[in-house]
């Protein structure tokens, strides 16, 4: 154990988190990583002992902090980080991913009941009611945005600015990785995209659907605009040397991903709706 609090990746769905998880897992021994995604994992690790917690260096999952005032998880301090994404695209991507990936717990519900995108966004079903409206604001603030919208938005903003060790943007993923590497002391940042829908989100919803999603996510849009501006300021503060590093990194990454694609083609890896789906 390093003596430092563990890192905690608060993974908002459809923000390139699966790609990031695979990259991060290369930097930490398996016994020091705790993943909390499935119901089984969440139930199994609902309570953990002090010795188990002490050896953890990375916790990752679709999770909430246990205490947003003290910024703790398992009643212990953590160094939390997250990624955010343009809200309309994120919701559309989540809906179509959940309808496409059979292993998720909403696949049967969405397909057997033929739930449309508009219904997904407005549903009061107990499994869907928090999905389509201001989800990022909810999980980054710890406040119900339906009850206290202004407080939730302001808390989410201040948490991103002051409490999170780091936040990145899905739309600036490579630049985000370089900044995350600095914050976490990481080395190798080469990656292949994981769990991505092959057909662009822009082709998956009509104008009326996009307008409905936007109307249901006004807080998330304000939060994303805030995050985008703050991220740009932090990148600008790094100066021209960071821009040069990013250019070199993206050149190397492009070569790496090209080689990976050639290997997959030669191996005859089948193409599906989801690119390199998670297990």
Give the positions of each predicted feature.
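Long, low-complexity C-terminal extensions of enzymes
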Residues: 229-279
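The conserved 3'-phosphoadenosine-5'-phosphosulfate
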Residues: 34-41, 152-218, 232-233, 237-253
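PAPS-dependent sulfotransferase catalytic core
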Residues: 1-56, 87, 94, 99-100, ...
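PAPS-dependent sulfotransferase catalytic domain
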Residues: 40-83, 89-192
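Short hydrophobic/aromatic segments of transmembrane alpha-helices and their interfaces
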Residues: 2-4, 72-73, 205-206
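Short amphipathic alpha-helical coiled-coil/interface segments
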Residues: 216-220, 224-228
């Amino acid at each position: 154990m390093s003596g430092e609090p563990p890192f905690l990746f608060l993974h908002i769905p459809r923000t390139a988190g699966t790609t990031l998880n695979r990259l991060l897992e290369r930097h930490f021994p398996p016994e020091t990583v705790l993943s909390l995604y499935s119901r089984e994992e969440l139930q199994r690790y609902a309570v953990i002992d002090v010795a188990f917690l002490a050896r953890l260096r990375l916790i990752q999952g679709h999770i909430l902090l246990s205490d947003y005032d003290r910024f703790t998880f398992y009643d212990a301090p953590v160094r939390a980080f997250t990624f955010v994404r343009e809200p309309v695209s994120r919701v559309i991507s989540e809906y179509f991913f959940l309808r496409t990936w059979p292993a998720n717990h909403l696949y049967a519900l969405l397909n057997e009941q033929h739930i449309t995108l508009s219904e997904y966004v407005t549903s009061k079903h107990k499994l869907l009611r928090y999905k389509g409206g201001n989800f990022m604001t909810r999980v980054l603030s710890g406040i119900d945005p339906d009850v206290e919208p202004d407080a939730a938005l302001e808390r989410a903003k201040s948490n991103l600015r002051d409490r999170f060790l780091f936040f990145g943007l899905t739309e600036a993923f490579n630049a985000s990785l370089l900044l995350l590497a600095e914050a976490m002391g990481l080395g190798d940042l080469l990656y292949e995209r994981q769990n991505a829908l092959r057909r662009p989100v822009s082709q998956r919803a009509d104008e009326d659907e996009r307008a409905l999603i936007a109307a249901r996510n006004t807080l998330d849009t304000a939060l994303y605009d805030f995050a985008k501006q703050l991220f740009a300021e932090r990148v600008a503060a790094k100066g021209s040397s960071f821009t040069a590093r990013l250019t070199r990194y993206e050149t190397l990454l492009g070569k790496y991903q090209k080689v990976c694609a050639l290997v997959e083609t030669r191996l005859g890896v089948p193409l599906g709706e989801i690119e390199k789906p998670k297990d």
